[in-house]
Amino acid sequence: MTKKYSLGFVGRKAGMSRIFTEDGRSVPVTLIEATPNRIAQIKTVEVDGYSAVQITVGARRAALVNKPAAGHFAKAKVEAGRGLWEFRVEDAHLGDFAVGGEIKADIFEVGQKVDVQGVTKGKGFQGTIKRYNFRMGDATHGNSLSHRAPGSLGQRQTPGRVFPGKKMSGHMGAVQQSTQNLEVVKVDVERGLIAIHGAVPGAAGGDVIVRPASKA
């Protein structure tokens, strides 16, 4: 597939490496495993109310696929993957896709700007210093109870409550995040790899969505 679309591509973060340019510069890159995305459904305005391409990627054991999903994949004659993703596509371009077809990494080209979406690393329950970069209290000089305490949570009897959104201790990480305007450094369709300049959200092994940059 040589045409360029605004739809995304689901890959898996493999880790980070570096690539040397012809002039000897070291470029840090994130390697994305870009196995072909299989088209499981074409959604149209007439039937679904909007136009989109639904894809799956990877493989999942039959024992782990529930009956509705198994029926969905069987109807499309597509091998069950590890999930389903949808990408909006203009109605005029739906004819370029077919159920059972594949979308490969060659929808991207070297030098193209992309946005990468993933789930950040989960850190569990964390205090305000790690979670929000609060300043620590004095280590000495009479301070014995509030080295890592967040400090005041509000005022007094008026307003008599803690305002919503107050930065406090709590769950950190494991949220969906996008990094924008990253450059594609290399695309290797045969090996199924995309090299992207810089870091992308999430841990190695996590699913990421690569799509053309919205603000390029």
UniProtKB/Swiss-Prot annotation:
GO molecular function term, any single one: structural constituent of ribosome
GO biological process assignments: translation
InterPro entries reported for this sequence: Ribosomal_uL3, Ribosomal_uL3_bac/org-type, Ribosomal_uL3_CS, Transl_B-barrel_sf
Gene Ontology CC entries for this record: cytosolic large ribosomal subunit
Lineage top rank: taxon: Bacteria
Keyword rRNA-binding appears in the UniProt entry: yes
Description of post-translational modifications: Methylated by PrmB.
Keywords for the protein's UniProt record, in alphabetical order: Methylation, Ribonucleoprotein, Ribosomal protein, RNA-binding, rRNA-binding
Modification type N5-methylglutamine: residues: Q157
N-terminal signal peptide: none
Family: Belongs to the universal ribosomal protein uL3 family.
General function of this protein: One of the primary rRNA binding proteins, it binds directly near the 3'-end of the 23S rRNA, where it nucleates assembly of the 50S subunit.
Subunit composition and interactions: Part of the 50S ribosomal subunit. Forms a cluster with proteins L14 and L19.
HAMAP family linked to this entry: Ribosomal_uL3_B
Stated name of the protein: Large ribosomal subunit protein uL3
Organism ancestry: Bacteria, Pseudomonadati, Pseudomonadota, Gammaproteobacteria, Lysobacterales
Gene: rplC
